[in-house]
Amino acid sequence: MPGGRDPMPSHTMELPRLIVIGEGNMGDLGPFLGSLGGPRTVSLISGRTVQGATGRKIEGSLKRSGIKWSWHMAGTNDPESIASVQEAVRSDESGMAVGIGGGRAVDTAKMAAFKLGIPFVSVPTAASHDGIASPFVSIKGDKPHSITATAPLGVFVDIGVIRKAPARLLASGCGDLVANMIAVRDWELGRDRKGEYYGRYAASLALMSAKIVMENAARFAREGVDERVVVEALISAGVASCIAGSSRPCSGAEHLFSHALDRIAPGAGLHGEKCGIGSIMMAKLQGQDWKGIAGALKSVGAPTTARQIGLDREDLIEALMTAQGLRPERYTILEEAGMSRRRAAALARVTGVA
């Protein structure tokens, strides 16, 4: 090799082919799916509420496009529920799985499509997390972190639908975006301490997505959170993970903290809320502007304390102490800090989280 360098290992990037963001455009879903290969039959994975709110427009659009469809309800994202939907999609002899809804529907469709080897299309109805455009899914009762499935072939967003979702979901999405600041710094640590692959472009894209929230927080506080800005940032973050070939640019110590809380206090807080709270504490450990992160989260209406999401001080301390052990191969600031009970308690206190 020139300069005596060892050859770099192969790196595969699976990216969305087509992304459409509009407003009042849910009735155009049929032509969108047709442009992705013209499936004759599609499986629509959703929830009852979302089906009731969007079903008529979607079905009319599919009918006009000559596409047959079947609806399947997403469960609780446990392996059994996903397997049940997967078998239903298999029975459809479907050419595409379409996830319509929040995290559960999108993740279920993503995993079913991956297992069956068919294309997956993401149709988010809430901007609560960056999984809408990434290849990763979170499965309850499986691994204590996200696992790789398949990137969406297409992403279709109706901002009008996103706007009708509870404001809490949008604030959660902002928390998931701010977390990228922690994740990228942890990725740099992995590169420097362990010789881990580091993709500068993917890292920059993830950081840009986080900065969108940080730089617009004051405006969002005055005028309300701009749904389109957050949606575009979440999609960019998902694409950053696609480019990296791993969740590294968007998942670091703050996500391990969130996954630890999933085990300690199931059902407490949304994913992005826990990642946002974790980001405040991890930023303090990393020497980043943790006060700025806390201020930005407050500006968008996201929680910044344990009490706001129904957790107590002991929950946080336990999560901080056990988080790194959930994924020991992923080097983060938690491994460097050596999180003892005393240090965890001090961190929660100093940052005002608990």
From Swiss-Prot:
Q: Which residues bind substrate?
A: 130, 176, 259
**Which key words tag this protein in UniProt?**
Cytoplasm, Lipid biosynthesis, Lipid metabolism, Metal-binding, NAD, NADP, Oxidoreductase, Phospholipid biosynthesis, Phospholipid metabolism, Zinc
List its EC numbers: 1.1.1.261
Source organism's superkingdom?
Archaea
One GO cellular component term noted in the UniProt record for this chain: cytoplasm
Q: What is its main location?
A: cytoplasm
The GO biological-process annotations, alphabetized, read as: glycerophospholipid metabolic process; phospholipid biosynthetic process
Which chemical reaction does it catalyze? Answer: sn-glycerol 1-phosphate + NAD(+) = dihydroxyacetone phosphate + NADH + H(+); sn-glycerol 1-phosphate + NADP(+) = dihydroxyacetone phosphate + NADPH + H(+)
Q: Which SUPFAM superfamilies match?
A: Dehydroquinate synthase-like
Task: Tell me the InterPro entries matching this sequence.
Answer: G1P_dehydrogenase_arc, G1PDH, Glycerol_DH
Needed co-factor(s): Zn(2+)
Per the record's keyword annotation, is Glycosyltransferase included, yes or no?
Answer: no
**Where does this polypeptide localize?**
Cytoplasm
Any one GO MF term held by the record is: glycerol-1-phosphate dehydrogenase (NADP+) activity
Cofactor binding note of this UniProt entry: Binds 1 zinc ion per subunit.
Please list the residues that bind NAD(+): 103-107, 125-128, 134
EC top class, in one word?
A: oxidoreductase
Q: Does the keyword ATP-binding apply?
A: no
Q: Which residues bind Zn(2+)?
A: 176, 255, 271
**Subunit structure, briefly?**
Homodimer.
Give the similarity note.
Belongs to the glycerol-1-phosphate dehydrogenase family.
Q: Check the record and name the HAMAP family matching this protein.
A: G1P_dehydrogenase_A
What's its job?
A: Catalyzes the NAD(P)H-dependent reduction of dihydroxyacetonephosphate (DHAP or glycerone phosphate) to glycerol 1-phosphate (G1P). The G1P thus generated is used as the glycerophosphate backbone of phospholipids in the cellular membranes of Archaea.
Q: What is this protein called?
A: Glycerol-1-phosphate dehydrogenase [NAD(P)+]
Origin species, per record, is Cenarchaeum symbiosum (strain A)
